[in-house]
């Protein structure tokens, strides 16, 4: 089952990598109430769109979790690919962002609205996700329905 999930998720995501134009939609700060969770041990992160705080290690999939920053050029280039993936997956795979190393929630919310993001975003004020995801961005994890990380992608997805 895990291999089918990984294969399907990667196929949809990588097929969307040929998309070079941004998706022309206005972003929206979305509630995290739809994120599937189990109990977690890491620090709970605030959701920019409301809902209970969620620990990064509590997320249950199928989910694609992308750790990013507004200041990160490769992260911004990935956004059309994730928007396209979300559109193609038709809700069968959650897309969740985790914003790190940010000045304020207001900066992140404005970025979301100006860059076509329409998925839930958690806000890592303290940098606690480094313990879970490691240093550097962008980082993308594929999480299965049991909450196990089944694939890690360090660095940006691109169209090559």
Label every model-predicted segment.
Residues 37-63:
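A short beta-strand-turn-helix
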Residues 2, 14, 43, 67-68, ...:
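Conserved hydrophobic/aromatic "anchor" residues
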Residues 76-115, 125-131:
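Structural microenvironment flanking redox-active thiols in thiol-disulfide oxidoreductases
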Residues 110-118, 123-160:
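Thiol/disulfide oxidoreductase modules built on the thioredoxin-like
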Residues 54-76, 82:
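Short active-site neighborhood of thiol/selenol oxidoreductases, capturing the structured segment around
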Residues 1-46, 156, 160:
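N-terminal targeting signals for export/organelle localization
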Residues 64-65, 95, 140:
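Hydrophobic beta-strand anchors of alpha/beta hydrolase catalytic cores
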Residues 61, 92-93, 118-119:
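A generic structural signal for alpha->beta connector loops
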């Amino acid at each position: 089952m895990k291999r089918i999930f990984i294969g399907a998720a990667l196929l949809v995501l990588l097929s969307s990598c040929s998309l070079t134009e941004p998706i022309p939609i206005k972003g929206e700060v979305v509630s995290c109430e739809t994120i599937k969770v189990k109990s977690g041990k890491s620090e709970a992160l605030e959701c920019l769109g409301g809902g209970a705080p969620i620990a990064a290690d509590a997320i249950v999939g199928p989910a694609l979790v992308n750790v990013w920053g507004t200041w990160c050029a490769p992260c911004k280039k990935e956004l059309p690919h994730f928007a396209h993936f979300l559109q193609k997956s038709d809700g069968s795979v959650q897309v969740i962002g985790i914003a790190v190393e940010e000045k304020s929630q207001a900066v992140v919310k404005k970025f979301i609205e100006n860059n076509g993001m329409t998925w839930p975003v958690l806000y890592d004020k303290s940098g606690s996700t480094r313990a879970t995801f490691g240093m550097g961005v962008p980082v993308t994890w594929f999480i299965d329905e049991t909450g196990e990380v089944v694939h890690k992608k360090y660095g940006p997805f691109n169209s090559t």
